[in-house]
């Protein structure tokens, strides 16, 4: 039986008002029981379409010696650049497993592409593009002999506005993240490459993500994300559930603690939620160095340790002998690992693990070319749809044959050196700059870096277009207050907002970049600002400046960063990106969710991050508190306009559906009745402008006693000028339910639901009601 974290409200009654230093907690025994124990670890069953893989895996495991079983539970060093490596069992024809970073393309190797980042996929709001991007990335991983990609990312979700890794995920919304991770998993695994969906779970800040030692040599443990059962299910678990439903073969447990139990040894999460409630058939791997217990972590549901384990090894055999661990648990750990290998047919026609991943690109090695001409259109389209136009005064864009283009800002040119993305830092203190002055920001920092085949910088693409048009180009990339030619037809200003693994950002804007924009706008009546942003970037200093005629949030488009932008600037492509987060007028509008939690008072050795806001993050919080954003979640402009009409809602069956879903055998993703389609919604959209364009129709639901509105559907449609299209949304039982912590079930609400359809979370011209 599953145990709830709390029947009502917040799970941990921490003494938030009295965190006095004189009562400093020095032992984790203080927190025992806050994450309820769930044992034993359930064995994989082969449910769903896993039956054949489990039959093969069990036959394989039956042939292993105890020593061979143990060697498959942890990584080893290899002569490759694989981030992690499971050693081979030669006598059984098992070649081993290569795992490698990351979710935006391969890092640290040659002959691969640098794809748009997760935040850019989120900005695209495009299911099909997410799938295609995943498939072409998967081809590259496969050619390089990478069995498992360490991604995609849906944790962090984006709770903390300054979160250092928000850019690796898709959106500050569980529904949008869930749809996009589902399509990404399907695309990647269509190429027989395993996915490691990460970081499970509530990994919402980089500050104190790992244990540290203070100046007095006291150990400060990883931050604890203290979260109630309802919030866990309705926000943070939601996209992981979608990933499991899509067939994800691996989940990576995170560095943080959850309700004061380390995520990689949290039996409630691994045994209870993931392997029982969601019916997960794959295996759980640690984030690198995230194992903090030995046999206890195995019993809690951890299957594989990376990059190696100092606590398992022969201790597993000893534990089985003395009864502290069942032999069946060890067998299940290996069965889950091997079932994944068989599930993706990696036992047939898969390249040798790590064959295209030389340990050092500067050493002699065979060139394994993973790029392909067929990927080019998807690379470019992914970059194009990364861009969100949020301001366009008096038709400043598209550009109209400018005679003189002046280009400014440190973000316009390609980095002066490029080393295949090998430089990153896993620290966890806040000391990094929030801008990247070494060139255009095509990707964020850390293990999510990629290794582009080239970088087509904005200035390079602008010069190519200027050559074709006979335009002149002036530039100054270094001056904070540059001279501006009076006859400039347009001034393009390039700035960025940097973020990296290991650090949370210090601010949502920076004075240097703001000064550059203001100084140029003061001397140029047609100033267009392009921001390459690894997360939210506020613009209160210049957003309303009369001479700032257009603003583009370009996010992290990957290697086609310049080519994509120029197509948009000149109207060869239309803007169709939409914001996957809320941009506030002032940073203070994010309230307690602006900054990460810090060690303090009695919890200085056991940092606490209390998710007391519940489900109210990003636009839900702005709606709840009545705060008007600068740019709403889902907002974005186009070169055309759209008109909405004719909203229709129909129930898919007569009668009133039951409050709880019917009982059923658990399949990967959970109770299959959660995904029964209960309601169909349609609306008509007409392109009222003069050019063709893609509109992102968004459906929000107001569930009784819940947030004002929650995203529960979207459809991106291409509509020709003057034409109309009908968009259709299907609402499942889960879409219309809330989590009942008492019953441990998803529950439909009796009463009146509100259904909204429109352009973004604040511009919803169509509204109807639905009664259950």
Curated annotation (Swiss-Prot):
Protein name: Probable beta-glucosidase M
Disulfide bonds: none
Recorded superkingdom: Eukaryota
Subcellular location, principal: secreted
Active site: 287
EC numbers, comma separated: 3.2.1.21
Reaction(s) this enzyme catalyzes, per UniProt: Hydrolysis of terminal, non-reducing beta-D-glucosyl residues with release of beta-D-glucose
Glycosylation sites: 259, 315, 322, 438, 523, 547, 574, 586
Pathway participation: Glycan metabolism; cellulose degradation
GO annotation (BP), single: cellulose catabolic process
Gene: bglM
Glycoprotein is among the record's keywords: yes
Leader peptide range in chain numbering: 1-20
InterPro entries recorded: Cellulose_deg_GH3 (IPR050288), Fn3-like (IPR026891), Glyco_hydro_3_C (IPR002772), Glyco_hydro_3_C_sf (IPR036881), Glyco_hydro_3_N (IPR001764), Glyco_hydro_3_N_sf (IPR036962), Glycoside_hydrolase_SF (IPR017853), Ig-like_fold (IPR013783)
């Amino acid at each position: 039986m599953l145990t709830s974290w709390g029947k009502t409200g917040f799970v941990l009654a921490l003494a938030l008002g009295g965190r006095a230093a004189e009562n400093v907690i020095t032992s984790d025994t203080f927190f025992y029981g806050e994450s309820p124990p769930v044992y034993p670890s359930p064995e994989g069953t082969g449910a769903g379409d896993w039956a054949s893989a489990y039959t093969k895996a069990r036959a394989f495991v039956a042939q292993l010696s105890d020593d061979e079983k143990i060697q498959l539970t942890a990584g080893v060093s290899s002569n490759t650049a694989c981030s992690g490596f499971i050693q081979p069992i030669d006598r059984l024809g098992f070649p081993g497993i290569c795992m490698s970073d990351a979710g935006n393309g391969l890092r640290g190797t040659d002959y691969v592409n640098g794809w748009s980042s997760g935040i850019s996929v989120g900005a695209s709001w495009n299911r099909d593009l997410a799938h295609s991007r995943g498939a072409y990335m998967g081809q590259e991983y496969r050619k390089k002999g990478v069995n498992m990609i360490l991604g995609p990312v849906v944790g962090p979700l984006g709770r903390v506005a300054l979160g250092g890794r928000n850019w690796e995920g898709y959106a500050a919304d569980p529904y949008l993240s869930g749809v996009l991770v589902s399509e990404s998993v399907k695309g990647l695994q269509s190429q027989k490459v395993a996915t490691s969906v990460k970081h499970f779970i509530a990994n919402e800040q980089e500050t104190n993500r790992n244990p540290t030692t203070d100046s007095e040599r006291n150990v400060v443990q990883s931050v604890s994300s203290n979260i109630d059962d309802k919030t866990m299910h309705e926000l943070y678990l939601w996209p992981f559930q979608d990933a499991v439903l899509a067939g994800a073969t691996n989940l990576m447990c995170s560095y943080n603690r959850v309700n004061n139990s380390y995520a990689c040894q949290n039996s409630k999460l691994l045994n209870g939620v993931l392997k029982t409630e969601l019916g997960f058939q794959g295996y759980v791997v640690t984030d690198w160095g995230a194992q903090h217990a030995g046999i206890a972590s195995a019993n809690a549901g951890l299957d594989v340790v990376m990059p190696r384990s100092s606590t398992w090894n022969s201790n597993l055999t000893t534990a089985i002998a003395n009864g502290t661990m069942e032999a069946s648990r060890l067998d299940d750990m290996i069965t889950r690992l091997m079932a994944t290998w068989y599930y993706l047919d990696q036992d047939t026609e898969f390249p040798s693990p790590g064959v295209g991943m030389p340990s050092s690109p500067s050493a002699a090695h065979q060139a394994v070319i993973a790029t392909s001409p067929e990927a080019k259109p998807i690379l470019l389209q992914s970059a194009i749809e990364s861009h969100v136009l949020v301001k366009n005064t008096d038709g400043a864009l598209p550009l109209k044959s400018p005679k003189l283009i002046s280009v400014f800002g440190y973000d316009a040119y390609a980095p002066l050196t490029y080393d295949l993305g090998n430089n990153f830092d896993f620290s966890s203190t806040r000391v990094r700059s929030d801008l990247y002055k070494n060139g255009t920001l095509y990707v964020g920092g850390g293990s999510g870096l990629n290794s582009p085949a080239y970088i087509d910088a904005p200035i390079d693409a602008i010069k190519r277009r200027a050559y074709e048009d006979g335009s002149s180009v002036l530039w100054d990339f270094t001056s904070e207050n540059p001279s501006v030619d009076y006859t400039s037809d347009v001034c393009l200003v390039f700035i960025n907002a940097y973020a990296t693994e290991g650090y949370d950002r210090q601010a949502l804007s920076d004075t240097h970049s703001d000064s550059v924009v203001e100084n140029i706008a003061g001397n140029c009546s047609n100033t267009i600002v392009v921001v390459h942003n690894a997360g939210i970037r506020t613009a209160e200093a210049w957003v309303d400046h009369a001479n700032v005629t257009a603003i583009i949030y370009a996010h992290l488009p990957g290697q086609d960063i310049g080519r994509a932008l120029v197509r948009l600037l000149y109207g060869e492509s239309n803007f169709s990106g939409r914001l996957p987060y809320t941009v506030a007028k002032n940073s203070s509008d994010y309230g307690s969710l602006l900054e990460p939690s810090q060690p303090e008072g009695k919890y200085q050795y056991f940092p606490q991050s209390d998710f007391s806001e519940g489900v109210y993050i990003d636009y839900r919080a702005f709606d709840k508190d009545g705060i008007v954003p600068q740019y709403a979640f889902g907002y974005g402009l186009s070169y055309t306009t759209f008109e909405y009409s004719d909203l229709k809602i129909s129930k898919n069956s007569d009668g009133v559906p039951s409050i709880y879903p019917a009982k059923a055998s658990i399949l990967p993703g959970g109770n299959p009745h959660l995904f029964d389609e209960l309601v169909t919604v349609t609306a008509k959209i007409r392109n009222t402008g003069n050019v063709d364009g893609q509109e992102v129709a968004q459906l929000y639901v107001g569930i009784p006693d819940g947030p004002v509105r929650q995203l529960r559907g979207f459809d991106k449609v291409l509509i020709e000028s003057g034409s109309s299209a009908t968009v259709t949304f299907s609402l499942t039982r889960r879409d219309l339910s809330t989590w009942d912590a008492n019953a441990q079930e998803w529950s439909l609400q009796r009463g009146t639901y509100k259904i909204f359809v429109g352009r973004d979370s604040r511009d919803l011209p169509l509204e109807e009601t639905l009664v259950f």
